[in-house]
Amino acid sequence: MFETLQEKTEEKAMVQFLERFTDYPFLVKFKNSEYHIGEGEPTFTVNFKKVIPLADLMKSTSLALGEAYMRGDLDIEGNLYEALDHFLGQMGKFSTNESALKKIMFSSTSRKNQEKEVTSHYDIGNDFYKLWLDETMSYSCGYFIHEDDTLYQAQVNKVDYILKKLHLKEGMSLLDIGCGWGFLLIEAAKKYKIHGTGITLSHEQYAEFQRRIKEQGLEDYLTVELMDYRDLPKKEYQFDRVVSVGMLEHVGRDNYQLFLDCVEKVLKPGGLFLLHFISALKEHPGDPWVKKYIFPGGTVPSLREILNHMAEDNFHTLDIENLRLHYNKTLLHWEKNFRDNIEKEKTMFDEEFLRMWDLYLSACAATFHNGIIDLHQILMTKGVNNDLPMTRWY
């Protein structure tokens, strides 16, 4: 009887906590009871198989709810993305005790630790990523020119768009920092006959990119290296163009200036640099659940802080573009592909991992849709370049 009474007390405390999220009405179900939160017809239902202690919700709302979902103690009845889209728009009401989460929220930005963090995500296995990415193996925001563009077409569009922005000419040298599986450099070599170098910390990406270079006979045009961006100045490289797509988020707030310093040292005077990154309106340490399970050490920079750092290296801004809704659509494609291949994925990973990954893709799509995060491309020059067209050429 005492246990039942205690459970009921914890249940009511939990419901009282959830009553702060009233922007969209929803149902909360427990084993023997249900509660209607907000006014109007419920837009989704959260089914709790176990009560989450109030202390856990107060310490980190996202961690408590995210881990409950991973364990199967929490289920969403209906469409996961739609529920998250309603709920995550209210992330400002989440509780986060940063001092109690120091190890998760503020991990070391040392070389050794960052290499470990990057490989923990990107070295899960190429076979896994091939199941839900498109044929290009692009793990970044696509660019949907037409409403009915496929994911593959959107990724081709994105790379074409970036290469046009870089104003490439035959024989130029191009560095890709965080080159992934190499699609951008392969396209640049084929279409513009540039000489490209890609650097990555991921052994899986390195091996696959090397295989692709040989497969397509591009050994005279492309090289890939396992390298930390901090080692670039030591190599005495000089490039006409530099690009970095979806890598800045791994650099860490303490290293933004160092990252840009390294780019400045290897970019020729007047050279173009395109920086493509997830951003936020304001500086924030990040989400505890994402930092613990998906991107350890990852931090989303604000647009304004990157612009401030750029000035220190005499980078002149040519253009800034926001592709937020393109990333929302990209993630929804990934999430659908992930679900369509769930039977194959079950042979690779356990249920908890698969629930975690599904939650990650759906939650990220929802945060982009709600403008909690953005996707920016900044096109800049090292110093002044008066030889470029006066109007946009892309």
Q: What do the PLM-derived regions correspond to, one by one?
A:
Residues 257-269:
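A short glycine-rich, Lys/Arg-flanked "PGG" loop and its adjoining helix->strand segment in the class I
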Residues 217-230:
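Conserved SAM-binding strand-loop segment of SAM-dependent methyltransferases
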Residues 170-178:
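Conserved class I S-adenosyl-L-methionine
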Residues 230-242:
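A short acidic, Gly/Pro-enriched loop at the edge of an enzyme's catalytic core
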Residues 1-155, 161:
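Feature captures hydrophobic
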Residues 278-388, 392-394:
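Substrate-binding/catalytic lobe of Class I Rossmann-like enzymes that use SAM or dcSAM, i.e.
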Residues 270-278:
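Conserved beta-strand signature within the Rossmann-like core of class I S-adenosyl-L-methionine
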Residues 181-192:
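Conserved SAM-binding loop of SAM-dependent methyltransferases across substrates and taxa
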